[in-house]
Amino acid sequence: MTKTIFESKTEGNWFLGSFQAFNYFTCFGNDESYEAIQDVFHRLLSTLKVEGLQLHVVQMTSDFQLLAFLVDMINQEYSRHIKVTQHKGAILVSEDDQLFLVHLPKEGTSLEKFFDLKNDNNFGDTILIATHNEGKTKEFRELFGKLGLKVENLNDYPDLPEVEETGMTFEENARLKAETISKLTGKMVISDDSGLKVDALGGLPGVWSARFSGPDATDARNNAKLLHELAMVFDKERRSAQFHTTLVVSAPNKESLVVEAEWPGYIGTEPKGENGFGYDPLFIVGEGSRTAAELSAQEKNNLSHRGQAVRKLMEVFPKWQLEN
């Protein structure tokens, strides 16, 4: 067995683990929390026939995050290919074609809803991202893949009409896209309206970030216009900015779910980095020196406005998903 110390720390969830001589776990919290974690821990390890996994739970708000952490440890230690998938409010643990564990929420889930498996494409929860942008979809796919969800985008639905972004706020635009497309497709849809807010420009480009340089805007033209607008702003503190994301999830006959997040930083004086898209080459992250375009995909997902918003979303998503 390896001596690796595994750790996962996200908002509301903090787990530590290692492999030793026997299965064991500890946790902070009340007796109810202890019993809930004990049940998940022992059922999973018994089903997968795993010995020697030791777990310490500092904080937990998500059963899915706990199962995903344990499965990731087991996969790394034993070179297995176990997957954790969300389906109709339940959490499924499987490997290849074998289902090992079904973890239901406390309030259960309806049989009719759970066993709606008319074909393989209906297995596993799917989210339709309301965008044609493959770069944005790639980020969401990496984030949601860790959460057991399959991701589609509008390129999979070429006959859908374009939804005009006529809102004056990020939430208005995100809600308009998600709710319209959900009604047209009957699917669960997530729309993110994201943009860059520059303090020296009164919050611009804001909801106009994608078309800041005009109707024929490109990333390069938008970046050039932003540098032009800030040409006489020399003090770094006055070049402060935030990437903002509003996520809206909509589904038929449901009240939409809304979360928001921001990523603070500064606008540089020249583009740097080859990764990312949009204003990433100009956005200096936090108090550091690297731009968002100089971060790896994993680093960006951990820090970014979109990554933060998705993590917030997944804290409230399971409960919302089960609501009538």
Curated annotation (Swiss-Prot):
Transmembrane segments: none annotated. Its cofactor is Mg(2+). Its EC number is 3.6.1.66. Keywords: Hydrolase, Magnesium, Metal-binding, Nucleotide metabolism, Nucleotide-binding. It holds the Pfam family Ham1p_like. Residues 128-324 are annotated as: NTP pyrophosphatase. It comes from the Bacteria. GO terms for biological process: nucleotide metabolic process; purine nucleoside triphosphate catabolic process. The active site is at D193 (proton acceptor). One of its GO terms (cellular component) is cytosol. The keyword Ribosomal protein does not apply. It catalyses: XTP + H2O = XMP + diphosphate + H(+); dITP + H2O = dIMP + diphosphate + H(+); ITP + H2O = IMP + diphosphate + H(+). SUPFAM superfamilies: ITPase-like (SSF52972). Residues 1-127 are annotated as: Unknown. Mg(2+) binds at E164, D193. One of its GO terms (molecular function) is dITP diphosphatase activity. Substrate binds at T131, H132, N133, E134, G135, K136, S194, F277, G278, Y279, D280, K300, H305, R306. InterPro entries: dITP/XTP_pyrophosphatase (IPR020922), ITPase-like_fam (IPR029001), RdgB/HAM1 (IPR002637). CDD domains: HAM1 (cd00515). HAMAP family: Non_canon_purine_NTPase (MF_01405). Homodimer. Pyrophosphatase that catalyzes the hydrolysis of nucleoside triphosphates to their monophosphate derivatives, with a high preference for the non-canonical purine nucleotides XTP (xanthosine triphosphate), dITP (deoxyinosine triphosphate) and ITP. Seems to function as a house-cleaning enzyme that removes non-canonical purine nucleotides from the nucleotide pool, thus preventing their incorporation into DNA/RNA and avoiding chromosomal lesions. PANTHER family: INOSINE TRIPHOSPHATE PYROPHOSPHATASE, INOSINE TRIPHOSPHATE PYROPHOSPHATASE/HAM1 PROTEIN. Belongs to the HAM1 NTPase family. This is dITP/XTP pyrophosphatase.
